């Protein structure tokens, strides 16, 4: 054994230059969610501007404004992060993940704010707290407690972090990335449908 020691073979699926890059997917997702939360605290989502306006006009106006803010926030954040030195392996995937998760956060929080007013915003804040621990952004889920492991698959931020990681460093299977996109799209469409249902109540 000592005369001919075993040689290990190492294979790298991705490369992360430092701890900041490793934590970036978590911080990017957190910033987009908080941005949507702040917007829905400041924007009068329940206010009707025109008494003679239709429910459809109200819905489209709220969705359009929220969508524009979400899009602008995502593009600005992604651009500034790259401009300040964040190394991105797949720029298209990076922007797409930022935009999609920004829409998901915006419309989910918008629905909660519209449906329940301030209690709904509080629920959105609780959702943020749960995602901080349960999305797997700081520590591997294998060393996280059972509660967070149980809710992990149901949190939108789980999938944005996963796709951001692949955009930054690669190494994640395409099928897993596609699943992340499908889940975020499902959250976005579901939130819009729930928001649309409110105008008929």
Please state what every model-predicted region is.
Residues 1-199:
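Membrane-spanning alpha-helical segments of multipass transporters and channels
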